[in-house]
Amino acid sequence: MVADAQPASVVIVGAGQAGYETAAALRERGYPARITLISAEDALPYERPPLSKAYLKGQEHFSDEQLWLRPASYYTRQSIDLVRGTVREIDPVARTVRLADGSGYDYGHLVLAVGAQPRGLDVPGARLRGVHTLRTARDAAGLRASLATARRAVVVGAGFIGLEFAAAARESGCEVTVVEALDRPLARVVTTPTAEHFTRLHRRAGTELLFGQGVAALHGDDHKGVTAVELADGRMLPADLVLIGIGVVPRTELAAMAGLPVDGGIAVDSRLLTSDPCISAIGDCAAFRHMRFGNRLRLESVQNAVGHARLVAERLTGRSRAYDELPWFWSDQFATTLQIAGLDDGHDSEVVIGDDPDAFSVLLFRGQELRAVESVNRPADHLAARRLLERGVGLSPVEAGAPDFTLKGHLARRREGSGVAVG
């Protein structure tokens, strides 16, 4: 339980996936005290993944309401006080948060689920009309409206958001160029075989991919908005829509002002507690000690947000444990789905399984230990990989390289050999 003998009021700053899930999990576990969920956005708490996928494509049947995690009546029914406003200050001594409008909320335990913000592009013209980032529902609505009339889009950054938007833009009939500073797409998150697949996928769809290129300036005027992107080598790319997708920066300002340590995010231990035992940090903003990997991590995924929220809810209702959930991620681009199980924290060998160039998995090993699996259009491999990694089922590169090897078959053989159900 929290520091007080009786259940104390909980204030959650941030109403994204992590913040919402914390409030919901607390009520599911019977937490009786007051719960205040503070949102800096006007919208009800909503799902973010569809923003760069189905929602962005402008499908008529996909409404804003379909993004909602719960309708407004849920918060009333569960006695969750949903407050709109921006928190300006945390007073850890008085255990109070103060909003920009001057209102304040006392807490027995504070949960910081403040997320992250898009990294800006520091070049001339970055504030021209028609230059977008994609993080919030408002961002997505603006992009969707621009995409309806845009003819030429330039995407700066070939990460998940950039490529998902590029796919949606091409499917909308827009000409698309992706500019990436590194030598391949998704360079920080996937192996070369997987990156090469997505290069082929986007080029087959008609997208121009430019690697090893920086942006020098964005051109346009107040009347027309953005009209071109100037590359570092002097080339000019015509554009009436530009998406900046070069990553995000965790929101750490509130924590730093409150005297909490910051280390690549709001620093927390394996139980997601900050240096103040009355303050937790979770989700995209939290740099945490992961029991599986040892080092401090900051992960950006729905799975991580939900797992963090549930752990905090458990701790506040009497069960304290370290966070050790296996990370997993996914991305949909055109008709292709990439799923990643585990985390590549340094591998020294790879094994590719699958003969189809459009459906394969890459197994990442460090020594004799499987660390992560990337699966392209092979959902059964992804599920088997998660079970293998979660349960620590042994697998060597030699075994994985056998001609008839499958992840599902290996899992079944190990299950039979141990007599333990691994389903």
Model-derived regions: residue spans:
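A Rossmann-like FAD-binding core segment of flavoenzymes
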Residues: 32-34, 81-98, 105, 172-270
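FAD-binding core/adjacent interface of flavoenzyme oxidoreductases
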Residues: 1-13, 70-154, 230-232, 236, ...
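Beta1-alpha1 glycine-rich phosphate/pyrophosphate-binding loop at the start
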Residues: 2-80, 168-190, 384
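FAD-site-proximal beta/loop scaffold in flavoenzymes
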Residues: 127-151, 222-230, 235-306, 311
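C-terminal catalytic lobe of FAD-dependent flavoproteins
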Residues: 7-9, 224, 233-261, 334-417
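Residue-level detector of alpha-helix initiation sites
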Residues: 17, 42, 116-118, 138, ...
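Rossmann-like NAD(P)H-binding beta-loop-alpha module
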Residues: 142-190, 194
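Mid-to-C-terminal Rossmann-like scaffold of FAD/NAD(P)H-dependent oxidoreductases
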Residues: 1-9, 15, 28, 285-383
